[in-house]
UniProtKB/Swiss-Prot annotation:
GO cellular component: ribonucleoprotein complex; ribosome
Originating gene: rplI
Annotated family: Belongs to the bacterial ribosomal protein bL9 family.
Protein role: Binds to the 23S rRNA.
GO molecular-function term, one example from the UniProt record: rRNA binding
One BP term from GO: translation
The keyword rRNA-binding belongs to this UniProt entry's keyword annotation: yes
Transmembrane segments: none
Protein name (Swiss-Prot/TrEMBL): Large ribosomal subunit protein bL9
Keywords tagged on the record: Ribonucleoprotein, Ribosomal protein, RNA-binding, rRNA-binding
Length: 150
């Protein structure tokens, strides 16, 4: 299916690109989440009329994400979990836990924005974590996991 991207999509393209994707990806994800639209002649003409407006909105989102990223970059978040004697946690620290902890510090971060490439944190100590505020803005945060002896 041919679609027009209404915003930048990772591994697919930028605003205004006309790309071919599988029908299910377009129907079930891109179109319902307002990231794309079917590439018909009328849709292409309507997009060209709204292009400047969409580019301005995308630039504003990027500027807001960069401003938030400057505040968030290098922050340390402390999370306490029950742990054993050997420093391994009972359970784990997930991206949702990190997003909640950042929220208590005044940062608006959703759990989908927290990137844990090696999976949930399962040991006590400091762990570097990437937070993707925008497709072009990724900042590093240190998560200090403190163990509570049981």
């Amino acid at each position: 299916m041919q679609i027009i991207l209404l915003e930048k999509v990772i591994n697919l393209g930028n605003l205004g690109d006309i790309v071919k994707v599988k029908d299910g990806y377009a129907r079930n994800f891109l179109i319902p989440s307002k990231k794309a639209r079917r590439a018909t002649q009328t849709a292409i003409q309507e997009f060209e009329v709204k292009r400047a407006e969409l580019e301005k909105a995308a630039a504003e989102k990027l500027a807001a994400a960069q401003a938030e990223g400057e505040k968030l970059n290098g922050q340390t978040v402390q999370i306490s979990q029950k742990s054993g004697v050997d420093g391994r946690l009972f359970g784990s620290v997930t991206n949702a836990d990190i997003a909640i902890a950042l929220g208590t510090q005044g940062f608006k971060v959703e759990k989908a924005q927290v990137r844990l490439p090696n999976g949930p944190l399962k040991t006590v100590g400091e762990h570097p974590v990437a937070v993707a505020l925008h497709t072009d803005v990724v900042v590093d945060v240190t998560v200090a996991v403190v163990g509570e002896q049981v």
